[in-house]
């Protein structure tokens, strides 16, 4: 028969009831599986948010005083500086130069060395040891002649730091010596303890305001001034008592956010941490009931592999089920995790082998259907061969307890089987019927251990991340970086621009005079003072009338009565614009503007004039004598010469010339850092550098706010009096009493333009009337036009100091300065450590053979000198007869260095003599003359951090370095916001 197509996969069945068999024993724990290999690296995550701005860094250590540079060429004379603010209290003067080194006085008692600091935990600095007691100063001896420089001894190990002696009395100023070669830069010392702050100096009194001067024309750029002569150094002042702590200053304005710093160098890979402790193994879960094979679900996401579970015990033996009808072959389900090995089932009946069906096409993954009815149990198939034990799968989740099933039917009694081996005790069985008491059997031995499980398959995903290892020991403290050179003193910032003065309001335009009214025929009686009427609109000027004929002169009228004081007339029209006002007084200084944006880096400026040479620092205390050197290397074995007779001791030769300095030895490894010296006093402020080029004009500021109402303008000048009309004809009879004023007539229409008449005779001035009452306030005039800008006011006092600006980008390195003038010689320093062994000098000329002398007397034993460098083999003298070996006398005193003798004839080569015993190392001699500075060697390897108490005494304070060149003027920043409007100027 042809097999039909493969049917769809059935729905997943419900979990079956648990079998009636008893629960199996808990199996022994399985061996822990091997850790799975790391999975592939995941995709790179998105970049994290930018980090917060770091906290403000701590203040840097005080810079080491720079080496004294050569004085630069004389610069051009600088512009006269503006008057500075009252200066603060100056520093104490430097101590005077010491004279020539005197003979050492009797040494004071040596102070006990301070106890060294305790070594702290790794990475943390231990507490600093207490300083030893201060030794008494020895009496100052007379100034002795300077001795010749001895050869440099070998460097001994650094001795412990002794107590610092008190400073000696200042000696007389010695003659100026030649400038020595530039010494190599010393190693960085540890940061010293910060001293207590001194009391704040008194604030200087503000000077009186000067009279406003006239604006002068900008003067031409003056030549740079010559550097001033260095003042005589003062004596060291006694250290004053520490002043009380000054009041805390007002918090400064919040600075702008700093730009992100350059990425730091990649740090060294940290030490691999120790593996974390192994986690506690969890208890094994109970074996779940085997459910029916469900339909294949959609593949889920790859999960992380769980920890290897313990090996489960064997399950309970189930009852064989009844044979069911074989169903159609379903699709292959997913490979399940192998369950615990069950007991071997009883063999079933062999079924007929079915015909092999054709493999069906793989169907699409269907959605999970609703659960179908339970199918009938099929007949058991033939027993297959025992398969290889599968790899242990990951532990399954603990299943929910199944519904208690119904007990199965009681099976027929089977044939008794063969007696099996005694197994491990089973779980308690169900209570059976009471049987006969049997004989107690002996307890069987424990069963053999099961075979070790095979290694499970590698999980699809990387394992869980292990617990973090314990923290490693703290790393050693790094070597402190070299102290930076103190920066140049910045040039004084420019004074803030003075705010513009407000413009005075423009005076209004004067209105035209009104037309003259008609002259009355006769003078009426003065009427009552009327109330001031409303201000009428300004009329146009009427046409000028024709000049009438001159009438006859009338009789002189009687003098009229004094008029009553009239009411104040209406406010006149605004007068014409006044002339520009005088120069106003300087207004108050405006508030400091906000900090401008950071400007772009400026162009490279011209080098500024060199600053004056600083004062020489106080001499450092004499160092402790160096440790005894180690024995030198044995010299090469020379050729054996015939022993000549011992010659007499010759007189000491004259002092020879100082030989040429040998080549510079190899650079030694960095020694322990010395103690930080006291910071040098601030050098004198050099002359201001030349002004930078003016930056481009900034963009125009925003339109100013609308100005307030201007002050009331002055009353305009009185208009010209009108022309006097012709006198009227004389009236008949005597002058009657004045009549009452008639009602005001209606305004007439303007008449036609008349012919311009001739100018009338100017009338006599009338009497001055009484002052009228103040008039009512007139309507506010229109805002005046912008007047001409006033002349610039005087320079106001400097405004308050603004907040510190952002640090500009580092400028380019300045050009190398010209060599400076020779400094005054410092006093002789203490003997330095023994230098590296130099190279062998050139071979000297052979000496002339000396005459054999009689053996000299045995001299007193002298101190062993430093081991000299191996000189070239000199010429051997003529072989003399072997003399008798005399007793070894004590070593004589070290003779003075003799002059180089004339070149002798080359002698015969002698036989090699026996090697003498190595001499004991001698005491350290005085320092030799410094050779010329060699090329800068490669940086040495970082030394291990030094311990407290082992550093040397503070060295002398070096002279302040020359003033660096003034940097270029940066670009002009954006204009600040407009200042508040100034006060109105005088009218």
UniProtKB/Swiss-Prot annotation:
It is found in: Secreted; Secreted, Extracellular space; Secreted, Extracellular space, Extracellular matrix. Residues 53-67, 894-905 have a biased composition (Basic and acidic residues). Trimers of one alpha 2(I) and two alpha 1(I) chains. This is Collagen alpha-1(I) chain. Glycans are attached at residue 89. Type I collagen is a member of group I collagen (fibrillar forming collagen). It holds the Pfam family Collagen. GO terms for cellular component: extracellular matrix; extracellular space. The modification Phosphoserine is found at residues 95, 589. It comes from the Eukaryota. Keywords: Extinct organism protein, Extracellular matrix, Glycoprotein, Hydroxylation, Phosphoprotein, Secreted. InterPro entries: Collagen (IPR008160), Collagen_superfamily (IPR050149). Expressed in bones. These protein fragments were extracted from an ancient skull bone collected in Buenos Aires in Argentina. Belongs to the fibrillar collagen family. Residues 23-41, 103-119, 137-155, 203-253, 362-388, 397-416, 458-483, 586-600, 613-640, 669-685, 714-723, 735-747, 809-824, 879-893, 921-954 have a biased composition (Low complexity). Contains mostly 4-hydroxyproline. Proline residues at the third position of the tripeptide repeating unit (G-X-Y) are hydroxylated in some or all of the chains. Contains 3-hydroxyproline at a few sites. This modification occurs on the first proline residue in the sequence motif Gly-Pro-Hyp, where Hyp is 4-hydroxyproline. The modification 5-hydroxylysine is found at residues 89, 254, 329, 553, 664, 834, 897.
């Amino acid at each position: 028969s042809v097999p039909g197509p493969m049917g769809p996969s059935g729905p997943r069945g419900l979990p079956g009831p648990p079998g009636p068999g008893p629960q199996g024993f808990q199996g022994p724990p399985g061996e822990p599986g091997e850790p799975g290999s790391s999975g592939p690296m995941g995709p790179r995550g998105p970049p994290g948010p930018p980090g917060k701005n770091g906290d403000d860094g701590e203040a840097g250590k005080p810079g080491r005083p720079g080496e004294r540079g050569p004085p630069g060429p004389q610069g051009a004379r600088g512009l006269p500086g503006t008057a500075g603010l009252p200066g603060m209290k100056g520093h104490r003067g430097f101590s005077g130069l010491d004279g020539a080194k005197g003979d050492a006085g009797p040494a004071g008692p040596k102070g006990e060395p301070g106890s060294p600091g305790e070594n702290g935990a790794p990475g943390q600095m231990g507490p600093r040891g207490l300083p030893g007691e201060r030794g008494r100063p020895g009496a100052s001896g007379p100034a002795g002649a300077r001795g010749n420089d001895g050869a440099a001894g070998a460097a001994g190990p650094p001795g412990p730091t002794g107590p610092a002696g008190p400073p000696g009395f200042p000696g007389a100023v010695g003659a100026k010596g030649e400038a020595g070669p530039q010494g190599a830069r010393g190693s960085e010392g540890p940061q010293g303890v910060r001293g207590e702050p001194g009391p704040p100096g008194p604030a200087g009194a503000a000077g009186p305001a000067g009279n406003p001067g006239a604006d002068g024309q900008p003067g031409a750029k003056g030549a740079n001034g010559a550097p001033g002569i260095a003042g005589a150094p003062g004596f060291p002042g006694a250290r004053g008592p520490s002043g009380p702590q000054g009041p805390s200053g007002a918090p400064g304005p919040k600075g702008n956010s700093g730009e992100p710093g350059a990425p730091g160098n990649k740090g060294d890979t940290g030490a691999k941490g120790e593996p974390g402790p192994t986690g506690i193994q969890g208890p094994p879960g109970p074996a779940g009931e085997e459910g029916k094979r469900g339909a294949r679900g959609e593949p889920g996401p790859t999960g992380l592999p769980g920890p290897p579970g313990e090996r489960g015990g064997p399950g309970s033996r189930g009852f064989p089920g009844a044979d069911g009808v074989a169903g159609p072959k379903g699709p292959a389900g997913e490979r399940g995790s192998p369950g615990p090995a069950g007991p071997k089932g009883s063999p079933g009946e062999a079924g007929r082998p079915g015909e092999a069906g054709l493999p069906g096409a793989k169907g699409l993954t269907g959605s999970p259907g609703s659960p179908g009815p339970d199918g009938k149990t099929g007949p058991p198939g033939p027993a297959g061969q025992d398969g290889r034990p599968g790899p242990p799968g990951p532990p399954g989740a603990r299943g929910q307890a199944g519904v208690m099933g119904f007990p199965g039917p009681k099976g027929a009694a089977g044939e008794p089987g063969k007696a099996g081996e005694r197994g491990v005790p089973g779980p308690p069985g169900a209570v059976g019927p009471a049987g006969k008491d049997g004989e107690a059997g002996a307890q069987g031995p424990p069963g053999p251990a099961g075979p070790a499980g095979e290694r499970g398959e590698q999980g699809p995903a990387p394992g869980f991340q292990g617990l973090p290892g314990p923290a490693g020991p703290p790393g050693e403290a790094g070597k402190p970086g070299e102290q930076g050179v103190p920066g140049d003193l910045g040039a004084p910032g420019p004074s803030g621009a003075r705010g513009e003065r407000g413009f005075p309001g423009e005076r209004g335009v004067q209105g035209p005079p009104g037309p003259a009214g008609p002259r009355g025929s006769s003078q009426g009686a003065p009427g009552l003072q009327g109330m001031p009427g409303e201000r009428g609109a300004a009329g146009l000027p009427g046409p000028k009338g024709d000049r009438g004929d001159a009438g006859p002169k009338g009789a002189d009228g009687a003098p009229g009565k004094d008029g009553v004081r009239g009411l104040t007339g209406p406010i006149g029209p605004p007068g014409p614009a006044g002339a520009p006002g005088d120069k106003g007084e300087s207004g108050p200084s405006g508030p400091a503007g906000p900090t401008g944006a950071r400007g772009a880096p400026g162009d490279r400026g011209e080098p500024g004039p060199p600053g004056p040479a600083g004062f020489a620092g106080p001499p450092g205390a004499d160092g402790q004598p160096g440790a005894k050197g180690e024995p030198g290397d044995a010299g090469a074995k020379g050729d054996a010469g015939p022993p000549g007779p011992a010659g007499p001791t010759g007189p000491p030769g004259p002092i020879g010339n100082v030989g040429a300095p040998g080549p510079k030895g190899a650079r030694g490894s960095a020694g322990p850092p010395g103690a930080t010296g006291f910071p040098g006093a601030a050098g004198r402020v050099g002359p201001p550098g030349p002004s930078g080029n003016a930056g481009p004009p900034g963009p125009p500021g925003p339109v100013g706010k609308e100005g307030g109402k201007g002050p009331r303008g002055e009353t305009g000048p009185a208009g010209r009096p009108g022309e006097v009309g012709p006198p009227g004809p004389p009236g008949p009879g005597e002058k009657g009493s004045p009549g009452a004023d008639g009602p005001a007539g209606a305004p007439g229409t303007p008449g036609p333009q008349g012919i311009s008449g001739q100018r009338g005779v100017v009338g006599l001035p009338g009497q001055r009337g009484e002052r009228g009452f103040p008039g009512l306030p007139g309507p506010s005039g229109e805002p005046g036009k912008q007047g001409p800008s006033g002349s610039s006011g005087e320079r106001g006092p400097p405004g308050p100091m603004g907040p510190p600006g952002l640090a500009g980008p580092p400028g380019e390195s300045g050009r190398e300065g010209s060599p400076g003038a020779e400094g005054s010689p410092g006093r002789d320093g203490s003997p330095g450590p023994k230098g590296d062994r130099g190279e062998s000098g050139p071979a000297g000329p052979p000496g002339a053979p000396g005459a054999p002398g009689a053996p000299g007397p045995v001299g007193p034993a002298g101190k062993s000198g430093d081991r000299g460098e191996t000189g070239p083999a000199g010429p051997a003298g003529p072989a003399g007869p072997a003399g008798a070996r005399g007793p070894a006398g004590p070593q004589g005193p070290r003779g003075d260095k003799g002059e180089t003798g004339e070149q002798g004839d080359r002698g015969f080569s002698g036989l090699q003599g026996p090697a003498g015993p190595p001499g004991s190392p001698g005491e350290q001699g005085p320092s030799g003359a410094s050779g010329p500075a060699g090329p800068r060697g490669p940086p040495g390897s970082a030394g291990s951090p030094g311990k407290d108490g082992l550093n040397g005494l503070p060295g002398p304070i070096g002279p302040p370095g020359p003033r660096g060149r003034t940097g270029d003027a940066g670009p002009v920043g954006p204009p600040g916001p407009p200042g508040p409007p100034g006060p109105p100027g005088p009218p």
